[in-house]
Amino acid sequence: MSLIPSLSLLLMSMVAASYSETVTCEDAQKTCPAVIACSSPGINGFPGKDGRDGTKGEKGEPGQGLRGLQGPPGKLGPPGNPGPSGSPGPKGQKGDPGKSPDCDSSLAVSERKALQTEMARIKKWLTFSLGKQVGNKFFLTNGEMMTFEKVKALCVKFQASVATPRNAAENRAIQNLIKEEAFMGITDEKTEGQFVDLTGNRLTYTNWNEGEPNNAGSDEDCVLLLKNGLWNDVPCSSSHLAVCEFPI
């Protein structure tokens, strides 16, 4: 029987302790029976367990990282197209008058006359030793025997043409020049039997030998001046004396 009061007292102490956190001592004295006694607050307990994760939040704005270091310069690009021409610059100042060398007109005239005299002397020497002159033509031979094609090439090389007599005087001049039969600038290569000069013009003077031209062998397309001054048709591939005609 002595244990009952002790158990009742212990139970009331536990009830009073459970209200100590929310009920002040003064309130307890007003509302609780006289047997309830106030005590000091108890020691805090251990932290509770973590609660559950909350709902997923909205996506935040992108962050901004730190600016990196400046890289090395890149390679040079290809050159661009040329730009448009610029506007002309201002006109320059007028230059000083130039200086011309002193000319002695009398000396120039005397030198020109001396040159003309020398050229005339050389022409006379050539005429006497190698060629013949008739009017404004000068006939010259190198004394070589060659085909008609080579004779043409030789005369062209010296800005001349193959000798072609236009009258009896020119025919006689060539005859007096040669010591062998010589080619003349006359052919019928384009039209058989129609002899023309090397410019294609028909002849106004001829001096054919008796029975010529006869086209013997069907290939006599070139013309020779014989040593007696008469003409004869022969093959152009044969070799005869070269005589060139120079205008003067």
Swiss-Prot record:
Residues 1-20 form the signal peptide. It is found in: Secreted. Keywords: Calcium, Coiled coil, Collagen, Complement activation lectin pathway, Complement pathway, Disulfide bond, Hydroxylation, Immunity, Innate immunity, Lectin, Mannose-binding, Repeat, Secreted, Signal. Residues 134-245 form the C-type lectin domain. Gene3D superfamilies: Mannose-Binding Protein A, subunit A. Hydroxylation on proline residues within the sequence motif, GXPG, is most likely to be 4-hydroxy as this fits the requirement for 4-hydroxylation in vertebrates. Residues 42-99 form the Collagen-like domain. Residues 43-107 are annotated as: Disordered. One of its GO terms (cellular component) is collagen trimer. Disulfide bonds join 155-244, 222-236. One of its GO terms (molecular function) is D-mannose binding. Its main location: secreted. The modification 4-hydroxyproline is found at residues 47, 73, 79, 82, 88. Residues 112-130 form a coiled coil. Calcium-dependent lectin involved in innate immune defense. Binds mannose, fucose and N-acetylglucosamine on different microorganisms and activates the lectin complement pathway. Binds to late apoptotic cells, as well as to apoptotic blebs and to necrotic cells, but not to early apoptotic cells, facilitating their uptake by macrophages. Oligomeric complex of 3 or more homotrimers. Interacts with MASP1 and MASP2. Interacts with MEP1A and MEP1B and may inhibit their catalytic activity. This is Mannose-binding protein C. The gene is MBL2.
